[in-house]
A protein has these predicted regions:
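Hydrophobic protein-protein interaction segments
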Residues: 1-167
Length: 167
């Protein structure tokens, strides 16, 4: 799935509303919280985000074609930011380390240890500061980036998928 920080409302709504056992009130609360967290992207400062998407998320019709066009457009907008590095892990990549779900590792300036934010549909999204877990996620991210398409190739693929979703 597209990481929660990058999801448009229709995409997030489709994912959350279809989770078994979730009431409509729970879905609305989770949706509001997810969209509220996206304000982090608007904060001033030098934060940098490195994002790797599995190619499958570009093909899977979450919310339908209109939502997918909007989602592709959002990914392209974010990728144009000097603070975002966006890559796609292609189907042909050998490794499966990136198929375990989305996560964000935040490294703070100064002495503070890094923390991880882990997206989950089956449980509440969570933040971890457990050293072993964060180190494992940092290592996993390095492996995923090495197997991913270049930034230019990734943007080209997202543009192509946006064209496909519009036809």
């Amino acid at each position: 799935m597209v990481p929660g920080l990058f999801q448009v409302e229709g995409y997030a709504r489709a994912l959350i509303a279809n989770e078994p056992g979730t009431t409509s009130d729970q879905a609305e609360e989770r949706l509001a919280a997810r969209l509220d967290r996206q304000r982090l992207l608007d904060r001033p400062g030098p934060q940098m985000m490195w994002v790797v998407l599995d190619e499958g998320v570009l093909h899977r019709p979450v919310g339908g074609p209109e939502v997918m066009v909007e989602q592709m457009r959002r990914l392209l907008e974010l990728a144009e930011s000097p603070r975002v590095s966006l890559q796609v892990l292609p189907y042909v990549a050998y490794g499966t380390v990136g198929l375990l779900g989305s996560f964000v590792v935040a490294e703070m300036p100064g002495e503070a240890p890094p923390v991880a934010y882990i997206d989950s549909l089956s449980t509440e999204d969570r933040v971890s500061d457990r050293s072993e877990e964060v180190k494992s996620l940092i290592c996993r991210h390095g492996v995923i980036r090495a197997d991913a398409l270049s930034r230019r190739e990734s943007l080209g693929l997202i543009k192509e998928m946006m064209r496909r979703w519009t036809t």
